[in-house]
Amino acid sequence: MRHWYDQAIIYQIYPKSFQDSNSDGIGDLNGIRKRIPYLKELGINAVWLNPIFVSPQVDNGYDVSNYFAIDPKMGTMEDMDNLIKEMHEAGIHVIMDFVLNHTSDQHPWFQDAIKNPESIYRDYYIFAGENNQRPNNWGSFFGGSVWEKDPAGTGQFYFHLFDKRMPDLNWKNPEVRHAMTEIAKYWLEKGIDGLRLDTFIHIAKADLRQNFPVNSKDEEPVIAEPFFANLPQVQKWMRPFCEEIKQDYPDALLLGEAASANVNLAVDYTNKDNHLMDSVITFRYFTEDQSKIDPSFLNNYQPKPLDWVKFKQNQTIWQQTLSGISKPTLYWNNHDMARLATRIAKNDTQARSLAMLMYLQCGIPIIYYGEELGMRNLQFENVNDFQDDTVKEFVKSAEKAGVTSKEALLMASKTHKLPARGPMPWDNERNNGFTDKEPWIKGKKLDETNAADEIADDSSMFNFYKKLISLKKEQLFQDGNYYLWSTSDGSYVYERNLKDKKALIAVSLSQEPIEIEVGKEFSSERLSAGEYDLTAGKLRLEPYAGVVLEN
């Protein structure tokens, strides 16, 4: 059975940064509605909205305090109903971000749990320890311990894998599993077309009474990922959740965020026989070259180039292993990482070539808002703008090593996730048409691009992406087989074939011209970036150029 998402081309919208409609400096649902014609012009057929539920905004909406209502800063339920209706009228499906692993500490469940130790909601969360002693040495992804003292003064602690104001739900409790299923079904009944299942791989935890091995106490608390990521119970608990949704909404896309999952886990999570997800988003594609790191200070925000050899290996493993099982997601950037034009691409030509390379593989493209304009990260000039203590630690460490704070902030601006969430530039007016007030996010814009100019320029990045998306919709690039050519480290060449149709995607990863023997079979250009020459079966690519050739 074919589903709409088998041909999905998804555009990720970070609502706070897309379009402000009511002059408060924050993007909102009515702003997104205003830009539906733009999305239709680009050619995408689905949008993924980052969280829009009621939230204290400790983690930009990933801390939900009410799953059944729209955050007032985003708009109203009527606005959401209209957005769904108007997106559908434009032929665009709507995917919502659904946070399953944790809630806000302001959620009524948690508030009741800490006010009354006998509350039924106490078991909706993970409380452990006694006599003010933490149960183990596990560390939070946001720094410090995963354990925070129970505000009720019981001597216990509650578990939070992320910020201390985002307590983890206890998925061992069948009432929690039922409640989260009902929330998902509520939104699907409203007409949305799918859910991105945020951090679902963390819903199961190992025995809390064990410490993670460390060499010294100085290493504690420690990120004990084997104890809280991809455990077998994840599949056990997610299966009824997914089955119940698919029973009532068989055409709903279930897109799982499985950041640390390897390809074998991806097979488990998306194999139709397992009745789980339709596809997963992994962070395993992007192996970085660690050889350029300065060991004299913390490396978490030092820029690191992509290891292209490993990247080719990773892509091919995922393409080949998932073939016939599910479609992998194809992306270069999202709200949790620096932008393509900042992190990887050396120039406009390479950004275009890499887009061809990624999105014409077998899989579901996810294009991050503004990527189609060549948007870059903002530059933050104050450490507090990052809203992240780990950046403060990085800057202090760099200064001790003789790096100026200005240089350290520049590094962090190129690598941190928050500068990748800058306002969408629509035109040449104040704040590029995003808002007529001060935007919610501070930072210096480093590129001159805007949507109005890009649309008007036939040779622009926007119009390149428009052609690329149109090409991706063809059956060859949807259903064709994938075959990686054996070429030098300085190039990435693969073939898509379906019956008698073939396409060759050839991209230079080198700052020097390269030559590739492609034979005379591939002679017709479909799309290109940069300069190339094809003569007598020999393809010459100028630095970072790329081309799509067909037979």
Describe the predicted segments one by one.
Residues 2-185, 189, 202-262, 272, ...:
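Acidic/aromatic-lined carbohydrate-recognition and catalytic surfaces
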Residues 5-6, 216-218, 223-226, 236-238, ...:
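Loop/helix patches that line or flank the sugar-binding groove of alpha-linked glycan CAZymes
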Residues 513-529:
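Beta-strand-rich binding/interaction modules
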Residues 535-551:
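C-terminal beta-strand-rich structural cap/linker in extracellular carbohydrate-active enzymes
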